[in-house]
């Protein structure tokens, strides 16, 4: 986890040009300091960091700290901070995946975004607007199977490969990956509301798990080294690793990829000045130019009307909206409610067997 404090630099103008520097200025001139969350690696920080540098050039009284990590590590710390210092959030605003944003609904973590402060929210596709605008959709990713091409001669074809005999001791994934619990249940006669089949499958095949990780780098290192051969993973990040020269491939299972939207949101506990800064940043990130550039750099799919993709993205079904047409869409809101119970079951029925 990395914190970076950005202050004004002349570089911002060179990076962004006139259009990016025309973003709104915070009205208050008293010093304002916030923390903005971004994901680490795979170009995910490029656009928000550029936007933040430009904003601070226009608003020298504002200090924006960057917290760079992942939601798995950071979100529980945000919840803990809200319990102890509700008026002083650990993170004021930033990027959150669908797992964290739905958990935040249960934990009452999010402010409603004010459309008057964030007019670009009206350009987001309706299906990616949230109840009471407690966060807003930004990009969509697909989850499929990433694998080591040196170790796997034929690309995997099904989610069930993760618990098949051919991958004993060769599977890695994030710990407590509720999507993998759900897909195992769905493929074995259950669903989100009947999870017994899924837990039974993973319990019976716990020996397939080489390691459960909590960072992108850990998962990548296991796959590249050949210690693990296969993992459920995001199509855009997989594609970036492949372009970097990693000996990896990516496959969309025959049952479909898993839809995984990402969001921008503002945390509860912000004061008026902090809310204004966060709203300005969210609004600027939602511009068609920034949404397009973020999607192009990260190979994700913008959900902002008018955003554009590269020819490379348009021609690759794993990187454009085609992947969403046949995607598995878990009931993320129900998953958020059940996550505490499911984590306990995972510990008892699956992780216990890894000791």
Predicted segments, located by residue:
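Early extracytoplasmic/lumenal segment of secretory-pathway proteins
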Residues: 30-100
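Extracytoplasmic ligand-binding site segments that recognize negatively charged/polar headgroups
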Residues: 39-46, 72, 88-224
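Paired acidic/hydrophobic, glycine-rich loop segments that form the ligand-binding mouth/hinge
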Residues: 85-95, 212, 229-234, 249-250
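A ligand-binding cleft/hinge motif common to bilobed small-molecule-binding domains
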Residues: 101-103, 224, 229-247
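Periplasmic-binding protein-like
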Residues: 127, 140-141, 183, 200-205, ...
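A bilobed periplasmic-binding-protein/Venus flytrap-type ligand-binding module shared by bacterial periplasmic
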Residues: 144-151, 185-188, 261-274, 293-294
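Mature extracytoplasmic/periplasmic domains
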Residues: 267-329
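Conserved C-terminal helix/tail region of periplasmic/extracytoplasmic solute-binding proteins
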Residues: 325-355
